[in-house]
A protein has these predicted regions:
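Extended, well-folded interaction surfaces typified by the phenylalanyl-tRNA synthetase beta subunit core
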Residues: 30, 46, 63, 67, ...
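A conserved active-site cap/scaffold subdomain adjacent to cofactor or substrate pockets
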Residues: 260-276, 489, 495-498, 502-523
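Conserved alpha/beta core surface patches that mediate binding of polyanionic ligands
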Residues: 74, 80-81, 100, 208-245, ...
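Residue-level signal for inorganic ion chemistry
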Residues: 11, 277, 313, 490, ...
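A carboxyl-terminal module marker
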Residues: 5-8, 22-26, 331-335, 355, ...
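RNA/tRNA-interacting regions in translation and RNA-turnover enzymes
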Residues: 2-372, 376-392, 397
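Short beta-strand elements
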Residues: 34-38, 75, 283-296, 338, ...
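Polyanion/phosphate-binding surface patch
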Residues: 46, 437, 468-503, 545, ...
């Protein structure tokens, strides 16, 4: 946020203000010009006003005074000419004929960076101490006095918002002004005494041999105006805001001039500020204008005409403003207003109000000038509405709520990563990965295609700070070459918390698998299977839904743990699933299932199976053989140990049988259960225990 200092007496030179300094400060604040401070200096009051970036017109005394005129319903003296005590005005000599001192030449090599440049040659100047009133005025706004010539340029800067610069003309080689790009290796000592090495591309003001100023930022010491100066070249120009901003950042110098150029100066103000400064120098410093040069003239943008309906504005603001009052407010702010029909105007914004583009902007102008504090308080009308939620958003919400309910903690990581993080995670960087053109750091220059590297980094951070037990997840976007999808990544490690009649125990892969199955069941996803890849890779299982791969689940390898600096011996279980893939098959409709009116009966099955037989195949066969009677199926235990041959697993599966129409007898259940056992032995070659 930038601040603009202006004195109460300076405002009164433009506007006949009747309010006290304190009350005027309150009115300015209520009109959007927040007064940060008000202090009395040498018998005058000085306001320090916050200036928003889209209001460069407030960076001038005239701009502030114009606002004061609007909010106090007072005339703005735009054509005011300062009378300088004890100084007899001299007529400006506009001679342009060939004379010995008429040797100024101006050329612009980069017209895009400098679309308009004025140079006035003023001779016979006597640079001396400024009069007391000028020194006092500059001091009140935080500027120190240098000499009368420089002080006049600073005064016009603060009054018009147009930066000016005075060169000692006799120190310009060949009497030339050339606006060009710097050449690599050129150097310039600035007015602050600091030497800068100029990089190629920096916009400079140069004479025939060397740079004499950095355009729009600061002049050079070699051509500054001193007490020995007799002839000056007065500069007023318009520079491209982006060029000035880049230049100021490159050399590390920000000045009052560069700040205004960065926010774009008013084109008509370029000449207005120049003429005012020229007249004052001729009046106060004994100078004579002998030649005025101009290079370029930017095309004026087409003035945008805005149709403004006062009735609509009044309805929005809930205030009573007459057509005459509204037009007067806009006119005092510099707008051109034409009547079209009753309470409808055609409004044209002035050149210094580039922020006004639509009717709502004009409504704001009227509200500010009317006074925000005068707008009555009203109770807003509350209308019932329903917010549409997409299926992807609903699945994301359900997944997040379920994982939190199961004890997982959500983490949020950066969406940017690096090749190093992929390598540490043993993940190959996919071809076509999106990379930033101008990254702030090489550690964060790739758009992630997986959540796992960031989760691994999070695990490393926590484990190495004595937090070995964690259950974390992240739901976030990942980025393919041409599309953006949503994934959920989960990490699980350490000991499972103690439960009723159960002690702590280490987490297993099946805890994570169970969490995923709970998620799939909550989303009513059908047709999912966990398949062990052949040959076995880093992932223990790949997750397929209707034949399409949707994710993976596995154990972090020791090599990956070492690369991430993870020193715990316990396994870290990892999973990543595409929620976008789940969204294509999920069913979020809630279906009411009535409470069974008949009792159910549970039976357990214990079998020996090889590692190559997936549980999904066993489950599918049981559901097929017990169709119509099976109410629930759950894997109660998976055991590998002394009593189980190597390469095999002992599974205990709990089955719940029941009927919606009658109570099943033992004979009926035994028949169905025997059919299931027969299928497990004959079709899957399992061994019953």
């Amino acid at each position: 946020m930038e601040f603009m200092k202006i004195s109460y007496s300076w405002i009164k030179e433009f506007v006949d203000v009747k309010l006290s300094p304190e009350k005027l400060g309150d009115r300015l604040t209520m009109a959007g010009l927040s007064v940060a401070s008000l202090e009395e200096i040498d018998g005058d009051w000085v306001y320090d006003i916050e200036v928003m970036s889209n209001r460069p017109d407030w960076l001038s005394a005239r701009g502030i005074a114009r606002e004061v005129a609007a909010i106090t319903n007072t005339k703005f003296a735009n054509s005011r000419v300062c009378e300088f005590t004890g100084v007899k005005k001299k007529k400006i000599n506009r001679t342009t004929g060939k004379r010995p001192d008429n040797r100024l030449t101006v050329s612009v090599e980069d017209t895009k960076a400098c679309p308009l440049y004025y140079g006035n040659l003023i001779t016979g100047v006597k640079a001396a101490e400024s009069p007391a009133w000028l020194i006092k005025r500059l001091n009140s706004v935080g500027l120190r006095s240098v000499n009368n010539v420089v002080d006049i340029t600073n005064l016009c800067l603060m009054e018009y918002g147009q930066p000016l610069h005075a060169f000692d003309f006799d120190k310009l080689e060949g009497g030339a002004i050339i606006v060009r790009r710097a050449r690599d290796g050129e150097r310039l000592i600035l007015l602050d005494g600091i030497e800068k090495r100029l990089s190629a591309g920096l916009l400079v003001i140069a004479d025939k041999k060397k740079p004499v100023a950095i355009a729009g930022i600061m002049g050079g010491q070699a051509s500054e105006v001193t007490s020995k100066t007799v002839n000056i070249m007065l500069e007023s120009a318009c520079f491209d805001p982006v060029v000035i901003r880049q230049g100021a950042r490159t050399i590390g110098v920000v000045s009052d001039s560069s700040y205004r150029f960065e926010r774009s100066v008013d084109i008509p103000g370029v000449r207005a500020g120049l003429l005012a400064a020229t007249r004052m120098i001729c009046d106060m410093c004994g100078g004579t204008l002998v030649v005025s040069r101009q290079s370029g003239m930017p095309a004026q943008p087409k003035k945008q005409k805005i149709m403004f309906d006062l009735k609509e504005a009044v309805d929005v603001l809930s205030i009573r403003v007459t057509s005459r009052e509204a037009k007067n407010i806009l006119k005092r702010l510099g707008f051109v207003v034409k009547d079209k029909k009753q309470d409808v105007f055609e409004v044209t914004a002035p050149s210094f109000r580039k922020d006004v583009k639509v009717a709502e902007d004009l409504t704001e102008e009227i509200a500010r000038s009317y006074g925000y504090d005068k707008i009555p308080l009203t109770t807003p009308e509350i209308r019932p509405f329903s917010m549409e939620v997409s299926k992807d958003q609903a699945i994301e919400r359900v997944s997040r709520e379920l994982l939190v309910a199961m004890g997982f903690k959500e983490v949020i990581t950066y969406s940017l990563t690096s090749e190093e993080n992929y390598a540490k995670s043993a993940i190959q960087v996919p071809p076509g990965i999106n990379a930033l053109v101008n990254p702030l750091s090489q550690d964060y220059h790739l758009l992630r295609t997986t959540l796992l590297p960031a989760l691994f980094e999070c695990a490393s951070f926590n484990i190495n700070r004595n937090d070995p037990n964690f259950e974390i997840f992240e739901i976030a976007h990942i980025f393919g070459e041409a599309e953006e999808t949503i994934s959920v990544g989960i990490l699980l490690s350490g000991d499972k918390r103690a439960e009723w009649l159960k002690d702590y125990r280490p987490y297993t892969l099946y805890d994570l698998k169970g969490a995923l199955e709970s998620l799939f069941d909550e989303l009513r996803v059908k047709g999912y299977v966990f398949v062990k890849p052949q040959p076995a890779g880093a992932s223990i299982f790949c997750i397929f839904i209707n034949g399409q791969m949707a994710g993976s689940i596995g154990v972090m390898s020791e090599a990956v743990k070492k690369r991430w600096g993870i020193k715990v011996k316990k396994d870290i279980f990892v999973a990543e699933v595409s929620l976008s893939a789940l969204a294509r098959v999920a069913d979020l409709k809630k279906v009411f299932t009535p409470i069974a009116s008949t009792p159910s009966i549970s039976r357990d099955i214990s079998v020996l199976t090889g590692d190559v037989t997936p549980y999904a195949a066993i489950k599918e066969l049981i559901e097929k053989r017990a169709a119509g009677y099976l109410k629930a199926i759950a894997l109660a235990e998976c055991y590998q140990g002394k009593e189980v041959p190597r390469g095999s697993r002992g599974l205990t599966i709990s089955l719940t049988y029941g009927s919606d129409t009658k109570t099943l007898t033992d004979a009926e259940i035994n028949l169905v259960h025997s059919n299931v056992l027969e299928g497990l032995v004959k079709e899957l070659s399992l061994t019953l225990r």
